[in-house]
Amino acid sequence: MLAGRDAVTADPPSAATAPASWGRSTRRRYSIMLATAAIVIALDHLTKWLVTSHIPLGNQVPATNQIVNIHYIQNSGAAFGLFPQFTYFYVVVAVVVAGYILAFGPRMGGGLLRLVAFGCVLGGAISDGADRVLFGHVTDFIDFHFWPVFNVADIAIVGGMLVIVVQLGFGGGRPDRPPAERP
């Protein structure tokens, strides 16, 4: 109970009345998410730079096994190269996704894994979105022969979304509430 009010119907505290530790917790959650996004962006751009610097466009380099090749292509479409005429629509989608994650991601509840997942999606969206703005395409290079060619940002986006969807599917998606409002 909160000062004679039912905890279920009580309004959440404003920023002025929230405990100081709640603000630090939110900052910590944002820090984890943004650090993860920065790592994804750095890895994605490093790997793209290595590929574009050492492999001619369209060429393939077999890896040490028969499962994966490095195949340098430029993708102006969506996933799997679909709809290349909508390049700037994908930029808008990346901005909307990034904005949503920045606004609501750390407040969606869940633990460290979910924060890292949101950071992966954010980093992948920013990285591929930046490539579309700067170059008009995304560099893809990971080729498993049985699947369309993709990149590190794609792995981060798909992996992050998979974690988020699985966690939300198991009821872990309630927004964070201050300790006084928790059942």
Label every model-predicted segment.
Residues 1-183:
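Alpha-helical transmembrane bundles and membrane-interface segments of multipass inner-membrane proteins
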